[in-house]
Amino acid sequence: MAAMDATPDTAPETYAGRLLAFTIPSRDARGRLVRLDSTLDEILAAHDYPPPITHLLAEALVLAVLMGGLVKDDGSQVTMQAQTEAGAVRLLVCDYKGGELRGYVDFDAARLAELGANPSLFALFGKGYLAITFDLARGKGRYQGIVPLEGDSLAEACERYFYQSEQVPTLIRCAVRSDGDGVRAAGLLVQHLAEGEEGRERLHTKLDHPEWEHVAILAGSLRHEELLDPALSLEAIAWRLFHEEEEVRVERGAAIARGCRCSVEHYREVLERFPEEDREDMRNEDGIVLVDCAFCSKQFGIEV
């Protein structure tokens, strides 16, 4: 039976709006759990998206938190971008930095309307790609992986990213629900730790390592209803999945909040990089440059 270690011992349980990290030392595995409620509603409220796009963005935001939670330095940022030249969705962007989350979708409304109520990932994007970028703090560098946007969901595409770009066996589960109380979304990410590969055959060439197979089977048993159950804490989910393990260490991560970083100062700095003749073309009749933030839908009037 597992020993659930938390730091500190008296830490409250986590239900929503905060990341939960866990490790299973005996299986060389780590994981992240998150459930979004009010923060998700706040982000979505900035846009008037139709249901398929709302569902897509909700899943993407969960994935951004799960992947961002793998980077321990609060100053680091993870950006997920899905793009195509032929689909109803032209661009999806989400990023996560130190608990701050934001995202938006650019899409063709007319083409989307032709797809029906529950379009597949391929119907939304056509032939596209998924780019995931880790900008590490303190000068530790920046790295990016790009994979085809394939599978039945964004979660499957992210699994493929970890397999192909980082050679890390990964299982991801996401769940999204819309009802009268708003939109709720949650996710689980479990990985085989790189340290577990030392002295063994590389897992990206042989994905049937018994430790990983065992963890993946347990994690894969998680139901969408459990992920979304507001009365079930994230610690309880980890316990249900892995209670037979020798030890499961859990740690509460960052609180999640909407975090758009747009500002007049930021846009002025960007505009000042343009030649004066270009800025003149941008100004309206009042001499103001109007800038729209795609993430939060605010409009800024910049004198520059």
Regions found by a protein language model. Give the residues of each.
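Interaction interfaces in information-processing and related assembly proteins
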Residues: 2-251
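Cys/His-clustered metal-coordination modules, chiefly Zn-binding fingers
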Residues: 216-304
